[in-house]
Amino acid sequence: MSTAINSVEMSLSADEIRERVRAAGVVGAGGAGFPAHVKLQAQVEIFLVNAAECEPMLKVDQQLMWQQAARLVRGVQYAMTATGAREGVIALKEKYRRAIDALTPLLPDGIRLHILPDVYPAGDEVLTIWMATGRRVAPAALPASVGVVVNNVQTVLNIARAVEQRFPVTRRTLTVNGAVARPLTVTVPIGMSLREVLALAGGATVDDPGFINGGPMMGGLITSLDNPVTKTTGGLLVLPKSHPLIQRRMQDERTVLSVARTVCEQCRLCTDLCPRHLIGHELSPHLLVRAVNFHQAATPQLLLSALTCSECNVCESVACPVGISPMRINRMLKRELRAQNQRYEGPLNPADEMAKYRLVPVKRLIAKLGLSPWYQEAPLVEEEPSVEKVTLQLRQHIGASAVANVAVGERVTRGQCVADVPPGALGAPIHASIDGVVSAISEQAITVVRG
């Protein structure tokens, strides 16, 4: 497919691009689902595609890049127009050779590749910006504060579809990996159940499986396979329920605190390896653990620094030698501080001279996590599955829930807007992912049955 932009799209203004992106319901596919049209309002110098995909079991972005290289480049161009960026950067790992080979001959002036090392968490937005541009984002600040806007690969592809075809977000590409018969990466209708997604991979190969939504480091425990795929579903990771990654996620907060209080060795490795601390943020997990578990005096600013934790999980899964989870403790602190409407304003200190050498090699991470027996390539399958029912959650994004604009019994078509946020509210519209009939509407979701 050519990278040449149609004359109609070339003539679109920044406002017109953002409106098409809004109407298509594009949200950040790699994170919390921040509405893309709002992010594209920032006027910056650099538009950065975060293509690191540093969670070791996920294989989505690295395969979409070579499969849809031309569309990705055009998506970057549209985003650059919307943000006024003079430079576009696609940051990806050297091991993604097929993607590099596909993208390199397509790059126009003003767009370049930046090759990242195979380390974790290279895909942490703040780390990606630092490694790809040399700019450091201050604690609690947005990337736009240093002249950068960041989106991931799937988001940029959705931007291109929205601009060129006015095609709404009705599909999600995700990886099913781990203890499954046929690991794969597949594009599915939004609203398809995770149980059906698991079946596409031939089901679990262990008798008592546990499930993680996303990658092994930052993904959350899945409590029901009846949950639907959303715009932000990162993947489906299947492991024995006895695996430490599942068992840790099953620990309640009282247990997390009790373990920390009982076995902490005061070694401060969690801080020495904290990626945010390494690039100059005040965040010091070992001091926060002390403050919470041992009721030691701590400055208000130190406690507030918990709000800057990215929850990358290096402290728990790599650094701590005795099984403490500073990340879970930070998460508890963040919840309490946000309930009090607290905000952090702290300094950006000099980066640690050893920062680049203290990031975690992914091969070492796989071994450390006990994932070597379950690590699979998960090749991309181009055929899309057909489903008989979808459950479309009304809040698949940061901001207000969308409000249904259809009624039970109404016939809808794929791509039709079935819910939208109130005028002026932060959020994104929701679109039907199959042709069918609305069978149920609740405050949380719309159900569509094929027919």
UniProtKB/Swiss-Prot annotation:
GO biological process, one term: propanediol catabolic process
Pathway annotation: Polyol metabolism; 1,2-propanediol degradation
Short name of any one Pfam family annotated for the protein: Fer4_17
Signal sequence annotation: none
Disruption phenotype: Grows more slowly and to a lower cell density than wild-type.
Cofactor: [4Fe-4S] cluster; FMN
Domain 4Fe-4S ferredoxin-type: 255-284, 300-330
pH dependence per the entry: Optimum pH for cob(III)alamin reductase activity is pH 9.5, no major effect of pH was seen on cob(II)alamin reductase activity between pH 7-10.
Major location category of this protein: other
Keyword annotations from UniProtKB, A to Z: 4Fe-4S, Bacterial microcompartment, Cobalamin biosynthesis, Electron transport, Flavoprotein, FMN, Iron, Iron-sulfur, Metal-binding, NAD, Repeat, Transport
Binding site for [4Fe-4S] cluster 1: C264, C267, C270, C274
Annotated residues for binding of [4Fe-4S] cluster 2: C309, C312, C315, C320
Conditions for induction: BMC production is induced by growth on 1,2-PD vitamin B12 medium.
Record field: temperature dependence: Optimum temperature is 37 degrees Celsius for cob(III)alamin reductase and 42 degrees Celsius for cob(II)alamin reductase.
Cofactor note text: Binds 2 [4Fe-4S] clusters. The two centers are coupled but must possess different redox potentials. Binds one FMN non-covalently per monomer.
Localization per record: Bacterial microcompartment
Gene Ontology molecular function terms on file: 4 iron, 4 sulfur cluster binding; electron transfer activity; FMN binding; metal ion binding
Keyword Signal: no
One CC-aspect GO term: propanediol degradation polyhedral organelle
Family: Belongs to the PduS cobalamin reductase family.
Role of this protein: A protein that aids in conversion of cob(III)alamin to cob(II)alamin and then to cob(I)alamin in the bacterial microcompartment (BMC) dedicated to 1,2-propanediol (1,2-PD) degradation. The latter step requires PduO. No free cob(I)alamin is released, suggesting a complex is formed with PduO that finishes conversion to adenosylcobalamin. PduS and PduO allow regeneration of the adenosylcobalamin cofactor within the BMC. Another study showed reduction of cob(II)alamin to cob(I)alamin in the absence of PduO. Both reactions require NADH. The 1,2-PD-specific bacterial microcompartment (BMC) concentrates low levels of 1,2-PD catabolic enzymes, concentrates volatile reaction intermediates thus enhancing pathway flux and keeps the level of toxic, mutagenic propionaldehyde low.
Misc remark: Bacterial microcompartments (BMC) 100-200 nm in cross section are formed during aerobic growth on minimal 1,2-PD-B12 or anaerobic growth on 1,2-PD-tetrathionate medium, but not during aerobic growth on glucose, anerobic growth on glucose or pyruvate-tetrathionate. BMCs can constitute up to 10% of total cell protein.
Subunit-structure text: Monomeric when purified anaerobically, dimeric under aerobic conditions. Forms a complex with PduO. Interacts with PduT, probably via the N-terminus of PduS.
Protein's name in the database: Cobalamin reductase PduS
The organism of origin for this protein: Salmonella typhimurium (strain LT2 / SGSC1412 / ATCC 700720)
Organism phylogeny: Bacteria, Pseudomonadati, Pseudomonadota, Gammaproteobacteria, Enterobacterales
